[in-house]
Regions:
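Extracellular/periplasmic helix-loop-helix junctions in multi-pass membrane proteins
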Residues: 291-298, 309-332
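Membrane-water interface regions at transmembrane-helix termini and the short interhelical loops
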Residues: 30, 102, 118-140, 199-202, ...
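Hydrophobic alpha-helical segments and their helix-loop junctions in multi-pass secondary transporters
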Residues: 4, 87-90, 94, 126, ...
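Membrane-interface loop-to-helix entry segments
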Residues: 112-113, 125-155, 323-339
């Protein structure tokens, strides 16, 4: 049976939100400078309050679709806007992974080639049942967490924490406020876990384990931002497409063993893949009464994602400007939209 425990749900939270800010951290560091990690802490606190409010409301009805539809026509409109956010995440996942692989590993391989391999593999997984996806999420997220811990330990000796000083020089500038807004938008991807609440076998411990997952996620991202700035400095880390890859290249043991890229590529491929699966499968869950043929839907959906992803990744500078726009879109579709709907539903 398709059942989910609250402990398992914690892995869905991690899988949906752990990778984005870490992957293209230069987008945020370019705006927030050496204080980006502190700005992230503010973003995390704001988002935590909203997301936990969502979970408390969902405890009365675990089916998020029913919550939206209870608002009649207005609720249907909000549901479609909310679902569009899942499509945005699918595009973000496919394009960022393909761009990262192309830029860091296979420069001579075109991005469309990477996209095809990614979408074929994801299409195969999406055609499976929920239990298969659950197992994949649990194994992948757990393995990635272990890899992140090992990578952070290995990179510790290369960090120069003087790059983090002075703290909050110049106060809160316009760019820093923009960085906070964009990071809240990025964290909004955590909301793709909400459609999976309907699979919970029990509500017991939902807030507890979800809070633990969010705390782990925030600590890892917070540590990643600190290590990136301490390793490269605020100026350089804000002007490199994928700073974590540069960090991983520096790892060396006994002047002989170099394997940091292995951690990076494993984490990047696995977590973006999981995020894409969670977002795409959420759409299938929400509209399973409309989707009569799952295979045809996956083919059409993957084709649309391919076209949009290929278009926005034609140029890296162009793509990283698109990423800022995508964060704002996620903020509107995945945070503000359900916040509006849940507020009306609750009152």
């Amino acid at each position: 049976m398709d059942k989910l425990s609250t402990k398992h749900f914690a892995f869905f939270i991690l899988g949906s939100s752990l990778i984005a800010i870490k992957s293209y951290s230069s987008v945020f560091i370019n705006l927030g400078g050496r204080d980006t990690y502190l700005l992230f802490a503010i973003s995390a606190l704001i988002f935590s309050f909203v997301f936990l409010s969502f979970l408390k409301i969902c405890k009365s009805n675990l089916d998020i679709k029913e919550i939206f539809l209870s608002l009649n026509l207005f609720g249907k409109i909000l549901l479609y806007i909310f679902t569009f956010g899942f499509f945005i995440i699918s595009v973000e996942s496919a394009s960022t992974l393909s761009s990262s692989i192309h830029s860091n590993f296979f420069l001579s391989t075109p991005i469309w080639y990477c996209l095809i391999f990614f979408l074929i593999a994801s299409g195969y997984v999406l055609n499976k049942n929920f239990n298969s996806i659950l197992i994949l999420v649990l194994i992948t997220v757990f393995s990635t967490l272990i890899g992140d811990i090992i990578l952070f330990i290995l990179i510790g000796k290369y960090l120069n924490f003087s790059h983090l000083l002075p703290i909050m020089k110049g106060g809160f500038t316009t760019n820093k406020w923009i960085a906070i807004i964009l990071m809240i938008g990025s964290l909004s991807s955590m909301c793709i876990s909400l459609p999976y609440l309907k699979f919970l076998s029990s509500k017991k411990g939902l807030i507890k384990y979800s809070s633990m997952a969010m705390t782990i996620c925030f600590i890892i991202i917070f540590s990643s931002l600190i290590s990136t700035i301490a390793f490269l400095g605020p100026i350089r880390s804000g002007n490199i497409f994928y700073p974590e890859f540069v960090q991983s290249q520096r790892i060396q043991i006994a002047n002989f063993l170099e394997f940091g890229e292995l951690f990076y590529i494993f984490k990047t491929v696995c977590m973006w893949f999981i995020k894409y699966i969670l977002a795409s499968y959420s759409i299938i869950l929400l509209f399973k009464d409309i989707i009569t043929n799952k295979k045809i839907f996956i083919i059409i959906y993957s084709s649309i994602v391919f076209i949009v992803s290929w278009y926005i990744t034609q140029n890296q500078y162009y793509f990283f400007q698109w990423l800022k726009i995508l964060q704002l879109c996620l903020l509107i579709t995945l945070l503000i939209t359900p916040l509006l709907g849940f507020t009306i539903y609750n009152f």
